[in-house]
C-alpha cells in the first residue's frame, strides 16, 4: 500500500512555505534592490557561510535527490564521482576564475566574453547555448523530478503535478533579488542537510551499517517469480535484474557504460568547468561576496559540503534498492510501466519511496517541503536567468530601440514559451533517460558545454586568444556537438529486452569520449585561428586574463570631480569613448551627443563605469527601467525627470506598490552624495585585498579540501 502524507505532514509543508515567504519579503524590505549590485549581487555584502550554503543548495535540488539516488540504486557508487569532481572545480572557481571576474568588473558571463573578446558574436552564441541548456537539462528535468516527488507522496498524475508546480512557483516567487535567494537558500541548505542526514541514519539502522549496505546491495535482485504472479505480466522476459559487478567502484574500466575513467578525467571534467566556473547561477552567488576572502571561503565551504551527497543521497538510493528491489529494479518495460509509469526503468523513484516508507510522520512533511521549495527556487532562478539572457543578449540586439516595458513583456512571454517547451519535453525525458535521470542531464550537457569550457579556459590562460579564434572554434564545437545530440535523440536506446540495432558510432562511443573530442577540437581550432589572425587589443586583455595585474587602476576620467554632475557627465562620455561596447541605449531617441545638453535633474544613470576593470556602482534607477535593464552590458540609459514623474502620477499608488515590489526605484543624481560614490569605488578596489593571515588559512583549507576529494576518488575507485 502506498504511503501518503498525513495531516501533520501537510501542516508542516504549509508552515515551511510561509516561513520561506516571510524571509523573502524581509529581504525585499531590507535590501537595496534598486541598483545593479544591490539586485544582482546582493550589494556585495554576503558572507562566506551564506554563499557556501547557497552554492550547495542551488546545485543540490530535487533533481539531484531524484537523479543521484536513482543512479545509486541502478549502478552503485559511480555517480558520486560528479560530486567529488565538483569539490575540486569549486576551488578552481574561487582561486582562478572569481578574481578575474572581479578584476574585470563584470556581472554576467556573456558580459565577460564581450569584454574579453569584443563584439557580439560570442555573446549571442553563449546566450543561445545557455537557453538551450536551461530548457533541456534544467527546467524540464526540474519539473519532472518535482512531479515525481508529488506523484509518490500524493499519488497524483505526473502532468497534473507539473502544472501544480508551475502554479505554486508563480504564487510563491519573491522578487527580492539575490539577497532573498541567498537567505532562503541558507535555510533550505540547513534543513536539507539535517533531513537527509536523518534519513541516512534511519536507513543505515534499517540495514545494519555501511559495510552491510555494500554486501546486501550486491544481492539486491528482484523476485522475478513473485513479480510475474503479482502483476500478471504478458511479457515474461526479464533484464537488468542483478546489480552490476563493479557497482562498488566509482571510476571504472575504459569500456564501462556509466563512468569510464579516461572519459571522465579527459572529457567530463572539462565539461563540468562550464557549470562550476562559467554558469551564471553559480558565479553570480560568489560575486555577491564581501571580498575575495569571503568568495574563497564560500567555495571551500561548498567543497566540504559536496562530500555529503555521496553519503546522504547516493547511499540511501542504494539502500532503497535493497529494501524495495521488486519495484526499484523492475524486470522489464511492462513491469516498469505498472510500477512507476515509465518503460525505461524505475530507479528514479528510489529516494521518494525511501522517504515515504521510512521517515516518520512530521519529518516526512518537512523533507517534502524542502524538496519542493528547493525545486521552486531552481525554477524561479531559471525563469529569471533565461528571461534576462534572452531579452538583453538576444532580443535587444535585434531591436535596439526597445523600451524597458517592452523588454519586460518580451521576457515574460519568453518564460511562458520556455515552460510550454519544457512540459512538452517531459515525456521524452521519461523515456530517454533509461531510468537514470542524472546521466541524461550529463549526456546532454556533455554534447554542448565542452566548447564553452575550452573558450573560457583559453580566454583566461592564453592572452593571444582572440575573437575570431574563439568564435570559429566555439561554433565548430557547437555544430559537432549539436549533430551528435540530434543523432542521440534520433537513435534512442532500445528497451532493455530488445536488441540494440543503433549504428556503432552511437552505441559504442560513450558520451564522455565525445565530450573529450569536442573539448580538444574546439581548443585546437581556436588556437590555430587565433595565431592566423591579429591579436586582441591591450584593453581586451588588461583585466580579463589570469596574467593581468593584481591591482585595479582608476583613471582620472572615471574619478569623482568637484561637482557631482560634472563627474557623471565626464564619466559616461569618456568611459564610453574607451569602451569596447559603444552602442549605448538612449531612450526616447536621444543621441549620445545630447547628454551634454541635459540638466543635472534630467539625467539618471543606470550604468556602471568599468574603466580598467573598476566597477563603479550604478548611480540610480528610473522607475521605468527594470533591474535587469540596469546592467545591460555596461550601457547607459537616460530618461528625463519630468517623464518619470508623469509615469508615477499616472500609475498612482498601485504602480508605486508594483515598483517597490519589483525593486524599481528612482533616485536623482543630484541627491546622490559624492561620499556614496567614492565609498562604492573604494569597496570595489578593496575586494581583491587579502590579509596574509587570512590568505594562509584559506590556502590550508584549499589543501585540506583538495586532499579529501582526491582521497575519496581513490578510496571508492580501488
From Swiss-Prot:
Induction: Up-regulated in response to hypertonicity. GO terms for cellular component: apical plasma membrane; basolateral plasma membrane; plasma membrane; voltage-gated potassium channel complex. Residues 30-38, 111-123, 184-186, 325-353, 431-443, 533-695 are cytoplasmic. The record marks 24, 285 as: Implicated in sodium coupling. Gene3D superfamilies: Sodium/glucose cotransporter. The modification Phosphoserine is found at residues 594, 632. The keyword Glycoprotein applies. It is found in: Apical cell membrane; Basolateral cell membrane. This is Sodium/myo-inositol cotransporter. The chain crosses the membrane at residues 10-29, 39-57, 87-110, 124-144, 158-183, 187-205, 304-324, 354-376, 407-430, 444-462, 511-532, 696-716. One of its GO terms (biological process) is polyol transmembrane transport. It catalyses: myo-inositol(out) + 2 Na(+)(out) = myo-inositol(in) + 2 Na(+)(in); scyllo-inositol(out) + 2 Na(+)(out) = scyllo-inositol(in) + 2 Na(+)(in). Keywords: Cell membrane, Glycoprotein, Ion transport, Membrane, Phosphoprotein, Sodium, Sodium transport, Symport, Transmembrane, Transmembrane helix, Transport. Inhibited by phlorizin and phloretin. It comes from the Eukaryota. Electrogenic Na(+)-coupled sugar symporter that actively transports myo-inositol and its stereoisomer scyllo-inositol across the plasma membrane, with a Na(+) to sugar coupling ratio of 2:1. Maintains myo-inositol concentration gradient that defines cell volume and fluid balance during osmotic stress, in particular in the fetoplacental unit and central nervous system. Forms coregulatory complexes with voltage-gated K(+) ion channels, allosterically altering ion selectivity, voltage dependence and gating kinetics of the channel. Glycans are attached at residue 232. Interacts with KCNQ2 (via the pore module). Interacts with KCNQ1; this interaction is direct. Forms coregulatory complexes with ion channels KCNQ2-KCNQ3 and KCNQ1-KCNE2. Kidney cortex and medulla. Its main location: membrane. Belongs to the sodium:solute symporter (SSF) (TC 2.A.21) family. The keyword Membrane applies. It is a multi-pass membrane protein. InterPro entries: Na/Glc_symporter_sf, Na/solute_symporter, Na/solute_symporter_CS, SMIT. One of its GO terms (molecular function) is pentose transmembrane transporter activity. Residues 1-9, 58-86, 145-157, 206-303, 377-406, 463-510, 717-718 are extracellular. The lineage of its organism: Eukaryota, Metazoa, Chordata, Craniata, Vertebrata.
Amino acid at each position: 500500500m502506498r504511503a501518503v502524507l498525513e495531516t501533520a505532514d501537510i501542516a508542516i509543508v504549509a508552515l515551511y512555505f510561509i516561513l520561506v515567504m516571510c524571509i523573502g519579503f524581509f529581504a525585499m524590505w531590507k535590501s537595496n534592490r534598486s541598483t545593479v549590485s544591490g539586485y544582482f549581487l546582493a550589494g556585495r555584502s554576503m558572507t562566506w557561510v551564506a554563499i557556501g550554503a547557497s552554492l550547495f543548495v542551488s546545485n543540490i535540488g530535487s533533481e539531484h535527490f531524484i537523479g543521484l539516488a536513482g543512479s545509486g540504486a541502478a549502478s552503485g557508487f559511480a555517480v558520486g564521482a560528479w560530486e567529488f569532481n565538483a569539490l575540486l572545480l569549486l576551488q578552481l572557481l574561487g582561486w582562478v576564475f572569481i578574481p578575474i571576474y572581479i578584476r574585470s568588473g563584470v556581472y554576467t558571463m556573456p558580459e565577460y566574453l564581450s569584454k574579453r573578446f569584443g563584439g557580439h558574436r560570442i555573446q549571442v552564441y553563449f546566450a543561445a547555448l545557455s537557453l538551450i541548456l536551461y530548457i533541456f537539462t534544467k527546467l524540464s528535468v526540474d519539473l519532472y523530478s518535482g512531479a515525481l516527488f508529488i506523484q509518490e507522496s500524493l499519488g497524483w498524475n505526473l502532468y497534473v503535478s507539473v502544472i501544480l508546480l508551475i502554479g505554486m512557483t508563480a504564487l510563491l516567487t519573491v522578487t527580492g533579488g539575490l539577497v532573498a535567494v541567498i537567505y532562503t537558500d541558507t535555510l533550505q541548505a540547513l534543513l536539507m542537510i539535517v533531513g537527509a542526514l536523518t534519513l541516512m541514519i534511519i536507513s543505515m539502522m534499517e540495514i545494519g551499517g555501511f559495510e552491510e549496505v555494500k554486501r546486501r546491495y550486491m544481492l539486491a535482485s528482484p523476485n522475478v517469480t513473485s513479480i510475474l504472479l503479482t502483476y500478471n505480466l504478458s511479457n515474461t522476459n526479464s533484464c537488468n535484474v542483478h546489480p552490476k559487478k563493479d557497482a562498488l567502484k566509482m571510476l571504472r574500466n575504459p569500456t564501462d557504460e556509466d563512468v569510464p575513467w579516461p572519459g571522465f578525467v579527459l572529457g567530463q571534467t572539462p565539461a563540468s568547468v562550464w557549470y562550476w566556473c562559467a554558469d551564471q547561477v553559480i558565479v553570480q552567488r560568489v560575486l555577491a561576496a564581501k571580498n575575495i576572502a569571503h568568495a574563497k571561503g564560500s567555495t571551500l565551504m561548498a567543497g566540504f559540503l559536496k562530500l555529503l551527497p555521496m553519503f546522504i543521497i547516493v547511499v540511501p538510493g542504494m539502500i532503497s534498492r535493497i529494501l524495495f528491489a521488486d519495484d526499484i529494479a523492475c524486470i522489464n518495460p511492462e513491469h516498469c510501466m505498472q510500477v512507476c509509469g515509465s518503460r525505461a526503468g524505475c530507479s528514479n523513484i528510489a529516494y521518494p519511496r525511501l522517504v515515504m516508507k521510512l521517515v516518520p510522520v512530521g519529518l516526512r512533511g518537512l523533507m517534502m517541503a524542502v524538496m519542493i521549495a528547493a525545486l521552486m527556487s531552481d525554477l524561479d532562478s531559471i525563469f529569471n536567468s533565461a528571461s534576462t539572457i534572452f531579452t538583453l543578449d538576444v532580443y535587444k540586439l535585434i531591436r535596439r530601440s526597445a523600451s524597458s516595458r517592452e523588454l519586460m513583456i518580451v521576457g515574460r512571454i519568453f518564460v511562458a514559451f520556455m515552460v510550454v517547451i519544457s512540459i512538452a519535453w517531459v515525456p521524452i525525458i521519461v523515456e530517454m533517460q533509461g531510468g537514470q535521470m542524472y546521466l541524461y542531464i550529463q549526456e546532454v550537457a556533455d554534447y554542448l558545454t565542452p566548447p564553452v569550457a575550452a573558450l573560457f579556459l583559453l580566454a583566461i590562460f592564453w592572452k593571444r586568444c582572440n575573437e575570431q579564434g574563439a568564435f570559429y572554434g566555439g561554433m565548430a564545437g557547437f555544430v559537432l556537438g549539436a549533430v551528435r545530440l540530434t543523432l542521440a535523440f534520433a537513435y534512442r536506446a532500445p528497451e532493455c529486452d530488445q536488441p540494440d540495432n543503433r549504428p556503432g558510432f552511437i552505441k559504442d562511443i560513450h558520451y564522455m569520449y565525445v565530450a573529450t573530442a569536442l573539448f580538444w577540437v574546439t581548443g585546437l581550432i581556436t588556437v590555430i585561428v587565433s595565431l592566423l589572425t591579429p591579436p586582441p587589443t591591450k584593453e581586451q586583455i588588461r583585466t580579463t586574463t589570469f596574467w593581468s595585474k593584481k591591482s585595479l587602476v582608476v583613471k582620472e576620467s572615471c574619478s569623482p570631480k568637484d561637482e557631482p554632475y560634472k563627474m557623471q557627465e565626464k564619466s559616461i562620455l569618456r568611459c564610453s569613448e574607451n569602451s569596447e561596447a559603444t552602442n549605448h541605449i538612449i531612450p526616447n531617441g536621444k543621441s549620445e551627443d545630447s547628454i551634454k545638453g541635459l540638466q543635472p535633474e534630467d539625467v539618471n544613470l543606470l550604468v556602471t563605469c568599468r574603466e580598467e576593470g573598476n566597477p563603479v556602482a550604478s548611480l540610480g534607477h528610473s522607475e521605468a527601467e527594470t533591474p535587469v535593464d540596469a546592467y545591460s552590458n555596461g550601457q547607459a540609459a537616460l530618461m528625463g525627470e519630468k517623464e518619470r514623474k508623469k509615469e508615477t502620477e499616472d500609475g498612482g499608488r498601485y504602480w508605486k506598490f508594483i515598483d517597490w515590489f519589483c525593486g524599481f526605484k528612482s533616485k536623482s543624481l543630484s541627491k546622490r552624495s559624492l561620499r556614496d560614490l567614492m565609498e562604492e569605488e573604494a569597496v570595489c578596489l578593496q575586494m581583491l585585498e587579502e590579509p596574509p593571515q587570512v590568505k594562509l588559512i584559506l590556502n590550508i583549507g584549499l589543501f585540506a579540501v583538495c586532499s579529501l576529494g582526491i582521497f575519496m576518488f581513490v578510496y571508492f575507485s580501488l
